[in-house]
Regions:
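C-terminal alpha-helix
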Residues: 116-123
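N-terminal strand-loop-strand
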Residues: 1-16
Length: 123
């Protein structure tokens, strides 16, 4: 599973690529774009895994966020070949063994999505 250590996060903080939906863009296309921008890898969609909903505070305001996660299959590219205009977003990239990913990802919702991916691929 392609994972990133977001810029500014401590060593060992592994996360899944994600980002904001662009104007007129569907969630699946956003996910494909973000994977390419943050990892350098091109992917082919397999299926939607689910949504993670959470609330956080930004500049004193509560923000409700929904992040959609998709299962993709590797298509092309080299992990870490991040386009220069996005290199500031990512400190490090790594392939996580799928069986270990639920225990290595830093965020609960992402660990749950990794477990769903593992379950889906084990069928």
């Amino acid at each position: 599973m392609a994972a990133i250590r977001p810029a500014g996060k401590p060593e060992g903080t592994w996360a899944l690529p994600k980002g904001l939906i662009g104007p007129g863009e569907r969630a699946e296309l956003t996910a494909l774009r973000e994977v390419k921008e943050e990892t350098g890898v091109e992917a082919t969609p397999v299926e939607k895994l689910g949504d993670v909903r959470y609330v956080y505070t930004w500049a004193g305001e509560r923000v409700f966020k929904v992040v959609s996660f998709f299962l993709f299959r590797y298509r092309a590219g080299r992990l870490g070949d991040i386009p220069a205009e996005h290199a500031h977003e990512v400190a490090e990239t790594r392939w996580l063994p799928l069986e270990e990913a639920p225990g290595l990802l830093a965020y609960k919702g992402e660990r749950e999505m990794a477990a769903k991916a593992l379950e889906r691929l084990s069928r």
